[in-house]
Amino acid sequence: MSYTQLLKDFTEISYWNIDNLFNYFDLDIITKNTVNEILPLLTGSFFLDFIVNKFILPPITFLNQLIYFYYPIFESFKIFILKLFQNDLLKIFSNFPLFYTNIKENILNEDIFFKSQYSNSITLLQLPVYLDNKFFIGFLNSIFLSLPFSCNQLICFYRFFTSGPSYGIIATLGWLIGQCSLFFCLLFGFRPVIIQWFSLEPLNYFLAIFIIVNFLRKTINSTTFTQKNKNRKNKVDLEKLNKQKEIESIFGMHFLLSWTESVSLFSNFSSFNFGRESNILSISSSPSISQYYLTQGSYIFGIFIGCIFFSYIYNVIIIRLLFRFHKVFITSNNNKTNSEFKNFMNLVGFNTLVLIIGVTIASISNFDVGYLLTSSLGFTPQDKALSRILLNTNSSDPQIRISLAPGRRDGFIGNDNDFMYIDIFSFNDKEYKNTLEFEEVNYQVEYEWMSRYDKFNERERRPKPQKSIDTKKEFNNHSMKEYRSLDVFPTDRYKNRETKKIFNDNNSFINENYLNKNTKFNFYKEIMDSNFKLDFIPYKKAFFAANTTEADLFEVQQEIKQKYYINTIYKVLLNFEVDSMISRQLTNSILLEPQEADLFNRRVALSNYYESNYYYSKMNHFDLFRNNFFNSKSYINNVYNQQFNGTLRIVSKLFPISLNENPNQRSILKFDYPLIEEYRKNKYTHEEIIPDKFNQFSYDNYKGLLSTTSSPLYITWNHNLNQLVITNNLILKNFNTKSQLDSYPFYSIDENKLIQGPMTLTNLQTLNNLVRNSYSLFSNPALRKLFYVNENIFYQNDNIFLLDALDLENYEQYLFFKLNVSPKPIEASLKNSNSVNWYAFRYNDEIRDQKRDEEANKYIKYIVQEINKDDERNYKFKYDLKSMN
């Protein structure tokens, strides 16, 4: 947060209730009501009327105005003191970053220009919309604009100091009118002027340099300060001296400098703003065009008046301080000569000119030489068309760019010691901004751990073996060859042996990459998915057993993290930084614990839905895997976990995380820890947080994850296919009115149309994929009557009912129950199979009565009502025979 925002937020603590207080102290209402209440008491004679009009009403009106304008300020200070003693000040101050997200959102929505003010954006001395006091905001902003930090203002101060107040005021007016005209064009949208003027860069910049150099030349060639000081006692009479031409040149010079200069000392001070905007040129909100013109015009006028006032005050204060410094510290009471005073004045003027020259020279570094030469030709900075002409610091090899990035340099240097490392990214803005991502930023504890890896790799690094013959050339004439030998061995015997070996080798001229025998394989860093069966994994067991992790690697890492995390200062700073990052999100994104739990359930339901639609058809042993797992192999690979890819890794780097078996402890990881709570006995559902020790469990005894369900599921009768279909694709029926829902003709299931007796496997049909994860189970036309409705009112496939949740233990469930699904079953094998691996339909042998049919209709109607509610909860419904009884 910048100093401007910090100052603005601090003032908002005291004045946040000004608008509300203005609503209770309206000037017109107070004046009328007060007068109407007092007049009946005092009137009754002419003398009393005269006394009331002359002596009573003016003080009352003045008192009302005093209360209207100044009471909110005193009331704000009172609330500020109360908040200070109630320890709420720090809490209010910490919530300020949440406010700026609303402004960013309105900017993206493009509705910030003519939108009413925010209730929590009241600034210092700023009135409501109906009395927008932008004049005072501009007047206060001129406090920082008038500081003599730019070259133009330094020249104005020099004229004020050397030539007197008259020339100083003329120079200040030239600078101020030029500045206000620039603000006027920017705030009122004079695009032809602004775009055409700034498109001349860098010509306008060179124009500013020329004006400043011309001023320095005239100043040096002019008379000395002593000669000017002779006439300093006499007041300057502009008409008598007839220096109109000089006045016009001074005014025009400072006017042009206001449009051309771009550099100043302490440029951050000029961006300070007492208003609610981020800077002094931000457009404020207004309800109409006329109100916008009025507020912005008063704002510019306030800047104009304030700059004249504060510029004069600053110049007078600086000059008086210089004289007081000369009087106290330079000359004594007994030794005050005119020559010493003249020398002091000359020294101040000389130092001011040196400061002007220094600021001007320092501004040249803001423009690249290539940009200054090519921008007038239409080229942009770092244009690719000029990459072959100008010196380009961008690396063409992406691997080199990645290896040279901060945090990645050790891997590149370790693999190639012959590479000359040159860090050019700190001089190239384009490359420097794209080198680091958010996940790669290392905090102190992570830096210590990564630096330990660097030191460990440095100790284990071996010298890179080299060949005797490093380069070879082959000419067009194959009978003649040229060699350039770099001999690393001093003996002639070894040289002759290597030369003979090259002549005898037929493939000696083939360029080959010499492999480093000491290269370490980092296979152990790859964590295998523990849900794979061993028979399905194509790896070499001998090689896999030989590459195990180091035993002390995980323990040392935990010790380093614990060492830094128990440090109170580091812990507070880390928590403050993480909390501040989280607090900068939108206010509607901050959820409570019940909302987070509900969001987690929705995400699980959505992930199960997508997982049910996703087929791993390209995997080996797909049928066996689908039959055993019926879902993703691991929580790492499923859709739900992929949207949080990297979250657990980043958190585990910053904080010491461990699995705690205490059920009373609150969750330490959002989204992930509830999965561990659900499968507490089986920790390997989160195998990524288990230390790299392969002996902790056996692959043979690990049966993988439990199969998850895809909910909600629906069942209906497909009229086109004449089949019973179970699907997870929801088709909702929209009801416009409540009466339409009440008149929904839920058809009672007729007992005569119910098929008696169990179904046989011969009535089943081969499983077909109608839609994704929609299965056709029965082709018996008699089942259609169970889902029959009036086709004149509703279209086909509208009668979709919610399938019951997975409940294998309740065998008295009346309508449906769900089991695992086997993809593409063979009909011949199903007849001889004893495994229940189907969506099954249960039939009751008993005859149903009318009371049960009415209860069933009530439950079905309740389902449809819940579905048509416009929310996304995971509805589950159980239709139990016991509950009906």
From Swiss-Prot:
GO terms for cellular component: chloroplast membrane. Its main location: plastid. It is a multi-pass membrane protein. It is found in: Plastid, Chloroplast membrane. The chain crosses the membrane at residues 62-82, 135-155, 168-188, 193-213, 299-319, 344-364. Keywords: Chloroplast, Membrane, Plastid, Transmembrane, Transmembrane helix. Belongs to the ycf78 family. This is Uncharacterized membrane protein ycf78. It comes from Bigelowiella natans.
